[in-house]
């Protein structure tokens, strides 16, 4: 998420705007026994007040969806606070519903907080209803926002972009794609990323193909922890890379593989998908969220239903056996992703900011009894 914020921020700066990241150099948390995830939302309004007193005035404030409620509440009290744009990288309520459905599908335990009450969801829902504008990343989120009563004129759907480094590396690599093989999973080793389905699927494919290599990168856990989920007879062919430090390292990882697997039950719009597409990998993912907006099944990738281990296994097995098809899907994805630039994303975000500013001006004018 932070990478996306910096990439769009760079674009906005190029367009002539001034952008500050309050989670960076300005952020100073007070000592508290309360977990930071709960104190941060409460401190955002105070931080904006403090910066204003120091002469730092903002035209608009962008806040991540689960953190926006206290700021939106404070704006009702003090309308001199800048208008707020709520940015959702995957709606909290939809994430809750997706996890609940997935756990029931897999007969996993369901906590009371998941079923009835989740503080981040309550904060997010309040923010969505009371912010000046909402930015979301996929058409399913857009539709849900309208379903819960958010005016479509207060919604901007933005696509994530891909950095030029990946596009250039993919262009150079395309003629040599015959030399690539192996399957890559790139992401945190958590339930939401589909690890429960990935383990049996990839295990079966690796049993079918004794020379197949599989990489789990950026997982956030050490090798022993992740490998414990797999049978001993295939562990030697699984490479674990807990952390990735820079784009050069990431590009080298993509370069070594022909297939990306992303079986998440919920996402916003994963950067991994666009980067893999830029590098010409064939993508196997679920038919939901931002993946469904980009992947056309059988044309520039393969999609399967959430939790469908059999289809996931068959799709991966088919691509391993048919590298010509894998290259064809990868090349189609590489061509399509050329249009997904951070410049385009930044322009849409700037327009969303302007809509929030103009909406706030109209609201203040009406409160003062002024006419335009």
Spans of features found by a protein language model:
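Conserved acidic donor-binding segment of nucleotide-sugar-dependent glycosyltransferases
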Residues: 297-298, 302-309, 318-323
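Acceptor-binding helix/loop patch of EC 2.4 sugar-transfer enzymes
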Residues: 81-122
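A short, well-ordered alpha-helix in the C-terminal region of glycosyltransferases
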Residues: 311, 318, 325-339, 348-351
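Short hydrophobic beta-strand element within catalytic cores of glycosyltransferases
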Residues: 282-285
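Aromatic "clamp/platform" in nucleotide-sugar-dependent glycosyltransferases that forms part
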Residues: 265
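Carbohydrate-associated surface elements
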Residues: 140, 161
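Nucleotide-activated donor-binding/catalytic signature segment of Leloir-type glycosyltransferases, i.e.
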Residues: 225-248
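Short alpha-helical donor nucleotide-sugar binding micro-motif in glycosyltransferases
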Residues: 252-257
